[in-house]
Regions:
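Structured beta-strand-rich core segments of catalytic domains in phosphoester-bond hydrolases
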Residues: 22-23, 28-96
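Conserved beta strand-loop-helix elements of the APE1-like EEP
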Residues: 46-62, 191-212
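Metal-dependent phosphoesterases centered on the DNase I-like endonuclease/exonuclease/phosphatase
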Residues: 13-16, 37, 109-197, 201
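Surface-exposed cleft-lining segments at the edges of enzyme active sites
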Residues: 67-69, 94-110, 146-149
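Active-site beta-strand termini and strand-to-loop segments that position acidic
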Residues: 56, 81-84, 207-208, 233-237
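Active-site metal-binding loops of divalent metal-dependent hydrolases
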Residues: 22, 132, 229
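Short, acidic/polar
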Residues: 1-11
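Surface polyanion/phosphate-binding segment centered on an Asp-His-Pro turn
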Residues: 218-237
Length: 237
């Protein structure tokens, strides 16, 4: 990881950093972040997918992936940390690919994630974050009219996110800012970021019992270094 990443890490000074699509194995990471516990879930295929969490607080337990991975390839997409009052789950949701070639698996994965989150929510509050690879509503991307059949804005993916929220979860950014237009991802093509032709596909979602604890949700679109920018949740726990 680059020196620029370390600078951003220290600048944001968060209690938890959740990273997606790290594309690395733990032995490839050379970071000197004192005071953070580090957790990695790496794909079997090197240089692909993968997730990581850096936490100032030691978790009570750590788990990786779904409990039942029978129908899921080992792509390193999920990390779950348990703390005294809440669970923290980060995920890199599978992309449905061009022409929605992977949509069936994507929807299967979404159903498994709802089951996973609901099983946690029965025990304590849940914070779910990451690259969720969906722009939920038309306000969440620059050009909705031409993207209804594209990965990330298909009716199926949007309905899956609606279903997640209907299970007792809140999109924290949209909860605070129902009409604000900001994006968290821009294609590398056609100078999309320069033109702000973006999508909001990175989220912090929380269980409804945390609604009154939400203080702020931010999209740090002033930070460069990736096709995504960091998103932040400030919550009183």
């Amino acid at each position: 990881m680059s020196k620029g990443f370390e600078d951003i890490f220290k600048q944001l000074d968060a209690d938890f950093f959740c990273l997606q699509e790290t594309k690395c194995q733990p032995d490839q990471v050379d970071l000197s972040f004192d005071g953070y516990y580090q957790f990695f879930n790496s794909a079997e295929r090197k240089g692909y997918s993968s997730t990581a969490i850096f936490s100032r607080k030691k978790p009570l337990s750590v788990s990786y992936d779904f409990d039942d991975m029978t129908d899921h390839p080992k792509e390193g997409r999920i990390i779950t940390l348990e703390f005294e009052k809440f669970y923290l789950v980060t995920a890199y949701v599978p992309n449905s690919k061009d022409q929605l070639l992977r949509i069936d698996y994507r929807l299967q994965w979404e159903q498994a994630m709802v089951r996973h989150l609901n099983s946690l929510k029965q025990k304590k509050a849940v914070i779910y974050c990451g690259d969720l690879n969906v722009a939920h509503n038309e306000i969440d991307l620059k050009n909705p009219d031409i993207n209804h059949f594209n990965a990330g804005f298909s009716d199926q993916e949007r309905e899956a996110f609606t279903n997640l929220l209907s299970n007792g979860y809140i999109d924290t950014y949209r909860f605070l800012y129902p009409n604000k237009v900001e994006y968290s991802w821009w294609s590398y093509r056609s100078r999309a970021r320069e033109k702000n032709i973006g999508w909001r596909i990175d989220y912090f979602v929380v269980s409804e019992d945390l609604k009154d604890k939400i203080i702020e949700a931010k999209i740090h679109n002033q930070i460069y270094g990736s096709d995504h920018c960091p998103v932040e949740l400030d919550i009183d726990l």
